[in-house]
Structure formats: structure tokens, C-alpha cells
Amino acid sequence: MSFDAQFYGVITGMFTKARFFKCALQVNPAGYIKYRGQQQTITEDEYNQNLLAASLEAGIEVIGLADHGSVDGVDKIRNLFVENGIVVFPGFEIASSEKIHFVCLFDENKTSQELERILGRLDLLAPEDGILPTNLTAIQLIDKVNDIGGFIFAAHCINDDGVLSRKMN
């Protein structure tokens, strides 16, 4: 049964119990390794195939695809995953002016060009670089992504520099 059919069944009451989907909402494309200052040792296609195999083995049904300030690789991964029954919510990771990292995900049908335009609306300090933060505070960024129709959440929030650790200290 396709995701759309399953979801339709959930909202129309065809199912008498809740239907849950196994999700991985912060999946990185092959180019993400560059953010860490490293070089990829396999091709993008090999990376995507390995990612797909790991996702299928884990029973993942939905992924959120996010790279730091970039949407490169979205289309290739989305096409491959959709062909294999996995829903892809494309997006990106971005840091607020306080350097809090957020994952921003959008409608599964958003094109990489539309995502690029959204990135352009988020006041990045250096749009061509994609790594530097936005001028927007966390609250402003959350509001703006919500206004655009996206879903935003704190990335790696339990790390030492994550938003939860900052809040508790």
C-alpha cells in the first residue's frame, strides 16, 4: 500500500487503530561530509544506494533530508527513495544568529529550485557558502519557516552545544 493510500486510510477512519510510520528525520546527503571538512570516498550514487539499503533494512518509511545550507542531492535521493516506497521530506539544516542549528523540512513535492529560493529568503550571512548562520534569531527563523509552510525542529539538540544543553546550563 502506498504512503498516500495509508495516510488516506488514517484520516478517513478506515483504520480502527493509529497508524505509525518509522521515520528518520535528519538524514544527510553525500555532500554533508564536506561540512565536516572531509572528502567523500565513494560516489554520490554509491552513497545513495548504501543509504537506501540501510533505510530499508531498518524499516524506515519516511525520511527528512537535510544538509547544512544546501539542497544538493535532494532530487537524486528523492527519486531513488520514492521508487522504493520511502517518502522524502526535503529540506536543509540552518543555524540561527545564536548558532542554534535547526532542521527545516518541507512538502515532499518541493523541488530543489523551490528549496533554494526558500534558503534565499532566510537571510544567510553567506548564501554561497551555506555554512555560516542566518541573521535571524531562533524565534524569527522558526516563525519564518512556519510562515513559508515548513516544519522546523532543533537539530542534535542533546549534544553539548545543543539547544537543550544550553537551556539546562
Task: Spell out what each predicted region is.
Residues Q39-Q40, L65-A66, D129-G130:
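A generic structural signal for short
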Residues P29-D45:
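Acidic/histidine-rich helix-loop elements
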Residues S2, N48-A53:
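Extended charged low-complexity segments that act as oligomerization/scaffolding linkers
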Residues L51-H68, F151-F153:
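Divalent metal-dependent hydrolysis catalytic cores, especially in the metallo-beta-lactamase
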